[in-house]
Amino acid sequence: MPAEHIKPIINTENLDSPLIPTPANILISGNGDTRINIPFKAMDSSVISGIWESEAFSKLKSHPNEMEFCYLIKGDVKISDAQGNYSEFSEGEAFIVEPGFDGIWESKTFVRKYFVLAKCN
């Protein structure tokens, strides 16, 4: 029997969740369809964690009052701030998007990531 209050995040070959389209008002390029598996969500939605994936695409990304921890399971991303500065990450790397970020997320290839998103108000 598994330990109480312990929930594994299973990285299966194919996420068994429906495609979620990226809203047209933030989509920059690509089709923007994503899949997400959320095994944990706080009752007040202040913390969410799981697995997210997409094909190559780019979108506007804004984190005014939340942080996101990301660990790339597969793929390459480029994240650019509003001033045009950017950081690139590849499979096996982790990073944090801090509160106040405003810029562009680009999945340069197929991307799959573990993530934790937390409100910071």
Model-based region annotation:
Residues 1-46:
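A short, N-terminal "cap"/entry segment at the start of jelly-roll beta-barrel domains
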Residues 46-64, 98-99:
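Conserved short histidine dyad/triad with adjacent acidic residue
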Residues 51, 64, 81, 107, ...:
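Residue-level recognition of conserved beta-strand positions in structured domain cores
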Residues 51, 86-88, 102-104:
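Well-ordered beta-strand positions in beta-sheet-rich domains
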Residues 64-79:
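Short, conserved beta-strand element in jelly-roll/cupin
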Residues 83-99:
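Short acidic-glycine-tyrosine-enriched beta hairpin
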Residues 99-121:
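Ligand-binding loop in jelly-roll beta-barrel domains
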